[in-house]
């Protein structure tokens, strides 16, 4: 038989495929069960039997799975186990664990109570003590001043540029509140007592057994015991002590507070210990802005005696003189703008000194000349200006650009001292490393010793100090004479250290000794 006839006869005997594969096997056996009849497909490797067997196997698996699902549907549903809520990694972990019954309600409540008990001593997040940071903290007096207006003050020059002037933030008030200044930013209120020099005093006669808490109470009592004090007002700010020379740098809240203590001259601190109050070096006289002047009343009794270059201090007044009698002494010299006689709040007796200000500034010098040394009821009066130091010139606000020009031309009146302060030389992170701190110290010492003999160098660090962060990033150098400090300032202007242009300025020696940065 030829090949074509075999294929035709064999194919005619192949049973037709049925939709239901369960009947496939019997039909195939009946069609191929004859004697001498062979399935011609077996000789030529047909894939149909293999495919059929694979389909039957898949069907059996499908049928068994379906029957299983039927049986599971008839089975009663089990309760959800407690560990079904556990993460998948725990439920299917290879680590064996013992099956335990689901916890009871009492057990859950008890465990929650134990957890709450452990949290009783935890400090609430709103009471956490945050680490002191100087980021986004503006200098005193500049809290409501924009960066553009602060730059115009001349206090913050660009690195390498000479400092335009020693000035207070109130110097900006005329420009900031003018029409020209409002173009840059809305006019913010400036604090007249921003200068730290105006709020600091040198307190001499500090005892060796100095206790800060007792000193703070003593200072506050000096205010509270007099009519100068206003209710619910705190006056003390900070103190830095130089025990080697028995003095301290006291900082109070306002310039008027500092002038009040200065007017006391000296006070008994303890047995045979008297403290004296003096102005610091480079004291800056505060200004009274035109806006503040316009708000003052024509009645001198309603105005506070603000610190200014025209404020007068009169001491050694007879203790039996009242306010009206002292005012009568002052009226011949001009109309008063403000007046305050300091009295004891306990009995109303006079402390023997007063502050005043005339409406016409020229009357102040006339009054001082007429009152100083005058005999009054057996006492020789002493009259002088209360605020004597570096004065700041008021700037005309007629033209905005003219104001900027005047600020740029303003010359520094800083008094030369033996101490130089260096800005932009180091960062706080650099001096945290001990080795790097020593390297910077030696580098500064080597460079600045070229201009004269050095006494010492101070690089403030915030490690373990009470005033954390104050002075960090600055370097202070003290020479044996003022001339060497002046030469060093001229020679080192604009120099760079570690690719940073340093800025140099004089610093008060009294604050340097007391570490009052």
UniProtKB/Swiss-Prot annotation:
Domain RRM: 310-388, 418-509
Record GO biological process: mRNA cis splicing, via spliceosome; spliceosomal complex assembly
PROSITE patterns given in the database record: RRM
Superkingdom per UniProt: Eukaryota
Sequence segments annotated as region (Disordered): 1-112
SMART domains, A to Z: RRM
MF GO annotations: mRNA binding; poly-pyrimidine tract binding; pre-mRNA 3'-splice site binding
Record Gene3D superfamilies: 3.30.70.330
UniProt-listed InterPro entries: Nucleotide-bd_a/b_plait_sf, RBD_domain_sf, RRM_dom, U2AF_lg
Cell compartments where the protein resides: Nucleus
Keywords, in A-Z order: mRNA processing, mRNA splicing, Nucleus, Repeat, RNA-binding
Keyword Transcription regulation belongs to the record: no
Biased composition (Basic and acidic residues): 20-89
Composition bias type Low complexity, residue spans: 1-13
GO cellular component: commitment complex; nuclear speck; nucleus; U2 snRNP; U2-type prespliceosome; U2AF complex
Chief location: nucleus
Free-text function comment from the UniProt entry: Necessary for the splicing of pre-mRNA. The SF1-U2AF59-U2AF23 complex has a role in the recognition of the branch site (5'-UACUAAC-3'), the pyrimidine tract and the 3'-splice site at the 3'-end of introns.
Similarity remark: Belongs to the splicing factor SR family.
Quaternary state and interactors: Forms a heterodimer with the U2AF small subunit. Can also form a homodimer. U2AF large subunit (U2AF59), U2AF small subunit (U2AF23) and SF1 (bpb1) interact to form a complex required for complex A formation. Interacts with wat1/pop3.
Designated name of the protein: Splicing factor U2AF 59 kDa subunit
Organism: Schizosaccharomyces pombe (strain 972 / ATCC 24843) (Fission yeast)
Gene it is expressed from: prp2
């Amino acid at each position: 038989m030829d090949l074509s006839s075999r294929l035709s006869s064999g194919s005619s005997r192949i049973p037709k495929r049925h939709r239901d594969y369960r009947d496939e096997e019997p039909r195939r056996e009946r069609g191929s069960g004859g004697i001498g009849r062979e399935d011609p497909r077996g000789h030529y490797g047909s894939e149909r039997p293999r495919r059929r067997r694979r389909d039957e196997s898949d069907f059996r698996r499908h049928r068994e799975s379906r029957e299983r699902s039927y049986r599971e549907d008839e089975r009663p549903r089990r309760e959800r186990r407690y560990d079904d809520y556990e993460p998948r990694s725990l439920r299917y972990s290879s680590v064996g664990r013992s099956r335990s019954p689901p916890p009871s309600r009492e057990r859950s409540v008890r465990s929650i109570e134990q957890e709450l008990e452990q949290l009783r001593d935890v400090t609430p997040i709103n009471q956490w003590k945050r680490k002191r940071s100087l980021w986004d903290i503006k200098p005193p007096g500049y809290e409501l001043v924009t960066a553009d207006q602060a730059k115009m003050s001349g206090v913050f020059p660009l690195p390498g540029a000479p400092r335009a002037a020693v000035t207070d933030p109130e110097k900006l008030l005329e420009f900031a509140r003018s029409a020209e200044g409002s173009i840059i930013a809305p006019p913010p209120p400036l604090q007249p007592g921003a200068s730290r020099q105006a709020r600091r005093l040198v307190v001499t006669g500090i005892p060796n057994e100095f206790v800060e808490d007792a000193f703070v109470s003593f200072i506050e009592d000096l205010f509270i015991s007099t009519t100068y004090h206003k209710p619910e007002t705190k006056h003390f700010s900070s103190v830095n002590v130089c025990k080697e020379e028995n003095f301290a740098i006291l900082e109070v809240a306002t310039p008027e507070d500092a002038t009040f203590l200065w007017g006391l001259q000296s006070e008994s601190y303890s047995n045979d210990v008297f403290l004296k109050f003096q102005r610091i070096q480079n004291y800056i006289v505060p200004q009274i802005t035109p806006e503040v002047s316009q708000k003052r009343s024509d009645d001198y009794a309603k105005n506070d005696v603000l610190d200014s270059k025209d404020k007068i201090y009169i001491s050694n007044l007879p203790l039996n003189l009242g306010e009206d009698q002292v005012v009568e002494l002052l009226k011949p010299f001009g109309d008063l703008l403000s007046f305050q006689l300091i009295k004891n709040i306990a009995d109303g007796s006079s402390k023997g000194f007063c502050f005043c200000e005339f409406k016409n500034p020229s009357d102040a010098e006339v009054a001082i000349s007429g009152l100083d040394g005058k005999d009054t009821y057996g006492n020789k009066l002493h009259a002088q200006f209360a605020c004597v130091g570096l004065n700041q010139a008021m700037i005309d606000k007629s033209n905005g650009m003219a104001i900027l020009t005047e600020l740029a031309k303003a010359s520094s009146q800083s008094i030369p001292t033996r101490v130089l302060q260096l800005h932009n030389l180091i960062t706080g992170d650099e001096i945290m490393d001990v080795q790097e701190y020593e390297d910077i110290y030696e580098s500064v010492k080597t460079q600045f010793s070229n201009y004269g003999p050095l006494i010492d160098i101070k690089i403030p660090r915030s490690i373990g100090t009470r005033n954390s962060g104050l002075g960090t990033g600055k370097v202070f150098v003290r020479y044996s004479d003022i001339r060497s400090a002046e030469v060093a300032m001229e020679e080192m202007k604009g120099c760079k250290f570690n690719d940073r242009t340093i800025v140099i300025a004089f610093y008060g020696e009294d604050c340097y000794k007391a570490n009052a940065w």
